[in-house]
Amino acid sequence: MFRCRAFVLFALLLLAAPAAARAETPSNLAGITLGDAAKSYKGRLTIARERPVKNAPWMRRIPLKPDKYFSSGYVLVGTCAAPGRVARIKARYRDGSLDFFRRISGELLSRYGDPTEYKGELDGRIMGNKWGYIDPWTRPVSLIVQHVEGEDPETGAGNTIKLTNWGLLEAERACWQERHPAPARKKGPTGADHGYIPR
């Protein structure tokens, strides 16, 4: 039994080795590093414009200052487990063309290998790729690059890139929910289910 488990573990390590050898987990975007204190990036962020995130009180959003590569963007920082620490970085490239998107996608493919997921729509109005990693502390990290054609009211047109440490986001959510438990719901009388709800 031990030999079988050891063999399976060894086989999994061999399969994971090419992806791990290709590149380290990305942690920096637009000059900002995931997990760092946002206040240490006063030259890159507009700290005075920090705002709460709708439906996520465990996070706050701080705008990214435009530079020669990015026209806009933001970082999400924690409010509970690690207050002020950067958990997500999202930036919109100044060049919104499809050619630029293809060039960036090619560079990401050469650096990080094949994406783990396609992040687009079949009609081609939204195209994108997602890479998934595990950071040195075994927290999941994702990198998403997308191109949007036309004027989508939710995303806007152009090219965006987003780097997220899901472990940091989840730690913030769990901390906030532990400190702010949901009120207990009162059980009321159950109505007729008309036979379509299992009991």
Q: Where do the language-model regions lie?
A:
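N-terminal secretory signal peptides that target proteins for export/translocation
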Residues: 1-4
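Non-cytosolic coordination micro-motifs
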Residues: 22-63, 91-199
